[in-house]
């Protein structure tokens, strides 16, 4: 490779450091930031190219813009700046020569290279090596051959540590954490070895001498341990070979340096064999000596049968107050689930001790509907006759029992499905820092997700998962022995012989993946990789290991990491994460332009992340003793760094409801050992959630976390094992029944326009690359045909349809295309480097009319902008057939007012996806937008505000006919049209509008007539956000499971920045007149959502606009990562021309945004889950049309206010409307709890309201 300054490597030789202007691993975004800080024309730096290995990028600042020039090596290793055609090429031997020439004026660059820009070099604290690269003290164990722990360095005055020369803390610290012995070699003897090699020497005598000197103490320690182990081995095995004796005898003979090293390696190998075999020898000897049968294990575990026994659940029938009056008391049922037989038996006990039972086969159970408000309530829809259903609502003993019942029914459906390939699998993720101690004999609680936090119910713990992934750190067990231990434990637990798919190790960091035997042939494209993140990313005991594979048509990635320790090492942990993200080589090689967070349908990231709590130790212990975890989660470093968008951008994590897993006293889970003796003194290790499991999934995919907790009975380590179980939707290797697509039978992906706002000071041209598994090869667009900038740090680039390619999927079937995703990367024309990547789901883009999309751009783990566009996926009519997925069977009833409120949708069966006809039809109903999403406020940097009490809003029914016909036992009611819903905050589809960006209605549009609703058009209802802690995404009853039961949970970051004026569209079915009326303080009326109950946005200073406030936030603080994209809102002043049938633009969203509330930290760092309700109505023409501009029910807030005034309780109108009780027709279902949530606390007032409603029935 060409050199930087006459040295063999770009960074220069070790003896001659690289010049200040050269930055080896600097990213493009970081380079632009350094140049922006320099601020003077002619400032420059050189970094490695991100697009071409071995090439460089010269970045120059001129007139506040960054200009990038590629420096490419030729076949003779000469360097040259890439030039336009016809310009003569100048070649240089080194980068130093090249920079020297271009430092002169008029050499062809935009300006001369005047001011070299150096990187930021933050000095490490004196105890850096001690805190970062050596973990907690371990119990006395023999050294292991696999250990790579760095021994403590010594001072310069003592090259060899001896017992007579104690080291001092001052002598412990050395540059870069390297020992003084190594440092002295690099300074002096390295040159002598170099000269010897140039002279033809085949060995390195000085390096050998250095290694022998460094390992002399290790020699003696290994000899002692080997001698003791040999004696112990002979006790149990008389035939043991006297290997150690021979080794010690050989050592007494004079040896050269190389012979000493070979002897040490041999000893370590013998030591490894001794340690791995001595337990087996001892067990065999003791068993032979025993006259009775071999003793049973200390904690015997019962072998589980392969079949799942019938499970019974005690429930009560949930009925309305009127029905309860007729019946006399609530009826008790026993629900018996026979998974193997595919039956559900409802057993009702009669008063005369007789029993009445009804049996439903699996195919007659049409849907499960989870209540959002009552966590232990479940609605079950049964098929009584053809196309006629009956719903019963049951109250379980606990929410955990309800979840167990749902899992068993889901398993029953899966087991008896007629599909050849599964739609859904279960995945177990486990992470454990073992503390360099062998595991105990019994780790069943870890395998079965039993312990503290969100654990599985006893009924479901024995159900085997499809995939088990075990990540361990400081695991001293050998790879083969560890794999055998895992397989043996699973065999004993499940009677299944799980097959190992992959095992990857880095030092003592290991990841093992095992799958059910039946899935072995469904696994393909297995890949493994590892990354070191220790000293200089080469030494130490920290890093990551990863495994990836395809399960049929779904890609999975698993990363197990061990990051830098120490309370104060947050920045280094962040860098560890970014290094792993960039360097871990997993997945499809064709996707090398994307980091691993975008290469997989589902990516799981777990391990000992080592993020700590920023709080006084006594406060932490007090909160833990009271089991108050919310205040601790607010100061959790990982949550705070995710909030700043520093790490794990848009990853998800389940709610933490278990105590910190580190640092316990070994042998107990009752005491935290927070004092630790280090060579540099006593160190405080506060209890922390070091061990975590996070995940990131593509938009519009299905994933639910069923458990997340830690064990409380495994005490050998100072960490508790952590477990998480997931229900994951998968796709099959699709085979079209109609064969390959012909020219006349081809699907097309067509783009009308794309616009991106990119964080950059460059003004180059850009193009887009499109990748997808549904394409034969990746495609490129032409360069953008328009660009503009109103801010020096951002650039808006636009492509029209002429610049964008038409993509042709390899298969045209909708069942195949609705599971596909499109990866986009925005690249520059000058350096072909990526400025941002994203993923878009095709599912919501299918249809004959163009749909809008909006999502984030990110690069190397950093948010770099956003991108939006208009596209459609055209599918031939004869290939529109689709089927229901198993995970669409369970939904959430977020408008849970009892069984009368709605009729759930039933299984779609052989429903056809009819999105091709989207033309206006005046006879169809229009369903208004009843609530606007309230965007959360950016929290202060010092901590997170407490979440206010949550209130479950009411959503307006989409179908007026269903309101009057729904009953608790809906016999004789035909099933309504099926509904479909997509909910993924990492990607927004709302007729082109991200839900939280919808503005309040402008006065100019207050009386504007609406376009008529369209056939099969998506009807949307966006209720007010849930700001409290939550476990389950709040979604609508009857929706598809993409939203209802885990369609990719909210990402752990803030909502995207509001787009410029042109970004906001009014959905065609938005009725301005149906917006809730909120009375302001002045007594006037304003249409839009009611203001939040608490934490309003603080008033702005006089003369300050919202835009200037955001810009001020950027300028005032050093950490600009949270607000950098918010600056992009000032860029676009050009209208984004809507296509045919699309609505007009709205005024500036900066003036129309609803007030922000506090961020939701229930699921750490996830903003309040959006609830976009999209129902594809197939038979809307049959419904009674609503009057133009009127409410679907015919009764609005006006009727509510008149009724309240009539009984003298008008004071509660605002509270009731704010909580969704804005319709008299549904007010009859209100309960005392609902009234309290709406602010009715007076018992007499509550009684009056309920009695009046009862009489009105």
Swiss-Prot record:
Origin superkingdom: Eukaryota
Main location: cytoplasm
CDD domains listed in its UniProt record: INPP5c_SHIP2-INPPL1, SAM_Ship2, SH2_SHIP
Regulation: Activated upon translocation to the sites of synthesis of PtdIns(3,4,5)P3 in the membrane. Enzymatic activity is enhanced in the presence of phosphatidylserine.
Motif (SH3-binding): 945-950
Modified residues (Phosphotyrosine): 887, 987, 1136, 1161
Domain SH2: 21-117
SAM domain mapped to chain residues: 1195-1257
Positions with biased composition (Pro residues): 156-166, 939-951, 1049-1060, 1088-1104
Keyword Lipid metabolism: yes
Entry's induction text: Overexpressed in diabetic db/db mice.
Gene3D superfamilies membership: Endonuclease/exonuclease/phosphatase (3.60.10.10), SH2 domain (3.30.505.10), Transcription Factor, Ets-1 (1.10.150.50)
Matching SUPFAM superfamilies: DNase I-like, SAM/Pointed domain, SH2 domain
Summary of the tissues where the protein is detected: Widely expressed.
UniProt keyword annotation of Membrane present: yes
Biased composition regions of type Basic and acidic residues, renumbered to the chain: 119-132, 952-966
Substitution effect: residue 47 to A: Does not affect the ability to inhibit PKB activity
Motif (NPXY motif): 984-987
Modified-residue entries (Phosphoserine), positions: 132, 241, 353, 891, 1132, 1256
Entry keywords, A to Z: Actin-binding, Cell adhesion, Cell membrane, Cell projection, Cytoplasm, Cytoskeleton, Hydrolase, Immunity, Lipid metabolism, Membrane, Nucleus, Phosphoprotein, SH2 domain, SH3-binding
Bias-annotated ranges (Low complexity): 999-1008
Family, as annotated: Belongs to the inositol 1,4,5-trisphosphate 5-phosphatase family.
Subunit structure: Interacts with tyrosine phosphorylated form of SHC1. Interacts with EGFR. Upon stimulation by the EGF signaling pathway, it forms a complex with SHC1 and EGFR. Interacts with cytoskeletal protein SORBS3/vinexin, promoting its localization to the periphery of cells. Forms a complex with filamin (FLNA or FLNB), actin, GPIb (GP1BA or GP1BB) that regulates cortical and submembraneous actin. Interacts with c-Met/MET, when c-Met/MET is phosphorylated on 'Tyr-1356'. Interacts with p130Cas/BCAR1. Interacts with CENTD3/ARAP3 via its SAM domain. Interacts with c-Cbl/CBL and CAP/SORBS1.
Domain characteristics, as noted in the entry: The SH2 domain interacts with tyrosine phosphorylated forms of proteins such as SHC1 or FCGR2A. It also mediates the interaction with p130Cas/BCAR1.
Protein name (database record): Phosphatidylinositol 3,4,5-trisphosphate 5-phosphatase 2
Gene name for this UniProt entry: Inppl1
């Amino acid at each position: 490779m060409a050199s930087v300054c006459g040295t063999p490597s770009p960074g220069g030789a070790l003896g001659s450091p690289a010049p200040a202007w050269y930055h080896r691993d600097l990213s493009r975004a970081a380079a632009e930031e350094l140049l922006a800080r320099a601020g003077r024309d002619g400032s420059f730096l050189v970094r490695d190219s991100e697009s071409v290995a071995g090439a460089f990028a010269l970045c120059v600042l001129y007139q506040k813009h960054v200009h990038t020039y590629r420096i490419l090596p030729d076949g003779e290793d000469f360097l040259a700046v890439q030039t336009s055609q016809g310009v003569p090429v100048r070649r240089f031997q080194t980068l130093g020569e090249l920079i020297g020439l271009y430092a002169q004026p008029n050499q062809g660059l935009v300006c001369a290279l005047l001011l070299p820009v150096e990187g930021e070099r933050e000095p490490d604290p004196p105890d850096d090596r001690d805190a970062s690269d050596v973990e907690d003290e371990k119990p006395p164990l023999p050294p292991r051959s696999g250990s790579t722990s760095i021994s403590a360095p010594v001072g310069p005055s003592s090259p060899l540590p001896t017992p007579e020369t104690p080291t001092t803390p001052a002598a412990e610290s050395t540059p870069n954490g390297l020992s003084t012995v190594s440092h002295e070699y690099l300074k002096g003897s390295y040159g002598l070895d170099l000269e010897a090699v140039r002279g033809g020497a085949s060995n390195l005598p000085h390096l050998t001498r250095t290694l022998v000197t460094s390992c002399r103490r290790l020699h003696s320690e290994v000899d002692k341990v080997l001698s003791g182990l040999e004696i112990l081995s002979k006790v149990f095995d008389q035939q043991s070979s006297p290997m150690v004796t021979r080794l010690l005898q050989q050592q007494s003979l004079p040896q050269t340096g190389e012979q000493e090293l070979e002897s040490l390696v041999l000893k370590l190998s013998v030591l490894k064999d001794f340690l791995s075999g001595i337990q087996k020898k001892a067990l065999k000897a003791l068993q032979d000596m025993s006259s009775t049968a071999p003793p049973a294990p200390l904690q015997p575990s019962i072998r589980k049968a392969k079949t799942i026994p019938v499970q019974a659940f005690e429930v009560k029938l949930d009925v309305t107050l009127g029905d309860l009056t007729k019946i006399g008391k609530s009826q008790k049922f026993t629900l018996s689930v026979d998974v193997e037989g595919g039956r559900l038996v409802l057993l009702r006990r009669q008063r005369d001790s007789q029993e009445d039972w009804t049996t439903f086969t699996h195919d007659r159970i049409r849907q499960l509907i989870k209540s959002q408000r009552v966590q232990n309530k479940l609605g079950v829809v049964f098929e009584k006759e053809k196309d006629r259903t009956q719903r019963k609502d049951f109250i379980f003993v606990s929410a955990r029992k309800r979840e167990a019942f749902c899992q068993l029914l889901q398993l029953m459906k899966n087991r008896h499905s007629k599909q050849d390939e599964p739609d859904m699998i279960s995945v177990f993720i486990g992470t454990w820092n073992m503390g360099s101690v062998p595991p105990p004999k019994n780790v069943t609680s870890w395998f079965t997700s039993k312990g503290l936090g969100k654990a599985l119910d006893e009924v479901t713990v024995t159900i085997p998962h499809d995939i088990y992934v075990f990540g361990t750190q400081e695991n001293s067990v050998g790879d083969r022995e560890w794999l055998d231990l895992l397989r043996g434990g699973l065999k004993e637990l499940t009677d299944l012989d799980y097959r190992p798919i992959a095992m990857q190790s880095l030092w003592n960091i290991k990841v093992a993946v095992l799958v059910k035997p039946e899935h072995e042939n469904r696994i393909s494209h297995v890949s493994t990789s590892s990354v070191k993140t220790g000293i200089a990313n080469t030494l130490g005991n920290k890093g990551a290991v990863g495994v990836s594979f395809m399960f049929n048509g779904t890609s999975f990635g698993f990363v197990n990491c061990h990051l830098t320790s120490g309370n104060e090492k947050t920045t280094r942990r962040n860098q560890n994460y970014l290094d792993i993200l960039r360097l871990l080589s997993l997945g499809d090689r064709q996707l090398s332009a994307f980091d691993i967070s975008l290469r997989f349908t589902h990516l799981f990231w777990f391990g000992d992340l080592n993020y700590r709590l920023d709080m006084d130790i006594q406060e932490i212990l007090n909160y833990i003793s009271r089991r108050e975890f919310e205040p601790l989660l607010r100061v959790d470093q990982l949550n705070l760094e995710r909030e700043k968008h520093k790490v794990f951008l848009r990853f998800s994590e389940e709610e933490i409801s278990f105590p910190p897993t580190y640092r316990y006293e070994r042998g107990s889970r009752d005491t935290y050992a927070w004092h630790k003796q280090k060579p540099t003194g006593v160190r405080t290790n506060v209890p922390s959630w070091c061990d975590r499991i996070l995940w990131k999934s593509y938009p519009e995919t299905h994933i639910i976390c069923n458990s997340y907790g830690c064990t409380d009975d495994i005490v050998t380590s100072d960490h508790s094992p952590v477990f998480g179980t997931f229900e994951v939707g998968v796709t099959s290797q699709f085979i079209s029944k109609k064969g390959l697509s012909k020219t006349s039978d081809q699907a097309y992906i067509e783009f009308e326009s794309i616009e991106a706002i990119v964080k950059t000071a460059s003004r180059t041209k850009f193009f887009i690359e499109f990748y997808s598994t549904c394409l034969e090869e990746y495609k490129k667009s032409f360069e953008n045909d328009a660009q503009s900038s109103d801010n020096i740090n951002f650039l808006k680039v636009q492509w029209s349809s002429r610049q964008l390619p038409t993509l042709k999927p390899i298969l045209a079937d909708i069942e195949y295309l609705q599971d596909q995703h499109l990866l986009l990367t925005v690249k520059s024309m000058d350096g072909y480097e990526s400025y941002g990547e994203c993923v878009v789901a095709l599912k919501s883009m299918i249809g004959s009319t163009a749909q809008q999309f909006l999502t984030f751009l990110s690069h190397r783990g950093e948010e770099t902008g956003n991108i939006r566009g208009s596209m459609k996926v055209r599918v031939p009519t004869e290939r529109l057939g689709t089927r229901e997925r198993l995970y669409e069977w369970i939904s959430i009833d977020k408008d849970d007012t009892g069984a009368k409120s709605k009729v759930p949708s039933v299984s779609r069966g052989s429903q056809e996806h009819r999105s091709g006809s989207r033309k206006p039809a005046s006879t169809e109903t229009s369903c208004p937008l009843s609530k606007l999403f309230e965007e959360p406020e950016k929290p202060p940097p010092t901590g997170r505000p407490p979440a206010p009490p949550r209130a479950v809003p009411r959503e307006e029914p989409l179908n007026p006919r269903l309101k009057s016909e729904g009953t608790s036992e809906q016999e004789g009611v035909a099933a309504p049209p099926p509904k479909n819903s997509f909910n993924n905050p990492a990607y927004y589809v709302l007729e082109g509008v991200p839900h939280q960006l919808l503005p309040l209605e402008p006065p100019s549009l207050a009386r504007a007539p609406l376009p008529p609703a369209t056939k099969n058009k998506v009807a949307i209802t966006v209720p007010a956000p849930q700001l409290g802690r939550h476990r389950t995404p709040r979604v609508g009853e009857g929706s598809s499971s993409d939203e209802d039961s885990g369609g990719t949970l909210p990402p752990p970051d803030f909502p995207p920045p509001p787009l410029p004026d042109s970004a906001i569209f009014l959905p065609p079915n938005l009725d301005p007149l149906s917006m809730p009326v909120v009375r302001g303080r002045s007594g006037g009326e304003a249409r839009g959502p009611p203001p939040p109950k608490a934490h309003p946005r603080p008033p702005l200073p006089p003369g300050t606009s919202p835009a200037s406030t955001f810009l001020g936030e950027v300028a005032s603080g050093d950490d600009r990562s949270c607000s950098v994209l918010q600056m992009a809102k000032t860029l676009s002043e050009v209208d984004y021309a809507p296509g045919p049938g699309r609505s007009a633009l709205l005024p500036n969203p900066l003036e129309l945004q609803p007030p922000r509330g506090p961020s939701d930290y229930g699921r750490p760092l996830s903003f309040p889950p959006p609830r976009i309700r999209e129902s594809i109505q197939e038979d809307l023409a049959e419904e009674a049309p609503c009057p133009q501009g009127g409410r679907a029910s015919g009764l609005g807030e006006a009727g509510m206010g008149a009724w309240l005034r009539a009984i003298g309780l008008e004071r509660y109108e605002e509270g009731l409307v704010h909580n969704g009780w804005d319709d008299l027709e549904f007010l009859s279902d209100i309960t005392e709890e609902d009234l309290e949530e709406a602010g009715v606390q007076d018992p007499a007032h509550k009684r009056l309201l309920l009695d009046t409603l009862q009489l009105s029935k």
